[in-house]
Amino acid sequence: MRKITKNQLTDLSLYCELKISKSELQQAIGEDLHNVECKKAYCIKRSDVVNAIQLYKNGAISKDALVEWVNVVWFTELFVFDDEDADSIVSVLGVLETMDEDDAIISENELSEMITALTSNTEYTPL
């Protein structure tokens, strides 16, 4: 496992905000994002997830890019969630992560409800 540098922490911040792509993050940190030792992981905030949803709603990122982002921030050691925000964040990520499945349809209204749940720090419950 490789250790992460301060410059790479900046790259994590940029990826968190979707200002760089996964491939750009891999160029900075390493191809296998699941095997990078990170003593100080980047903390994902509820506002970061809201930003990702809004970028998707506005057409700035694709569904695939959103799902890829969810998988990186949720399933690598590079990112963590603040304990008081974790339930709200995970309740939304759990739904967003399924968006690439064949029968998954998430409406604009559901995306808005996810933003509301994140903004109020409550768990999102799909209908």
Q: Predicted regions span which residues?
A:
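Acidic, Ser/Pro/Thr-rich low-complexity regulatory regions
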Residues: 1-127
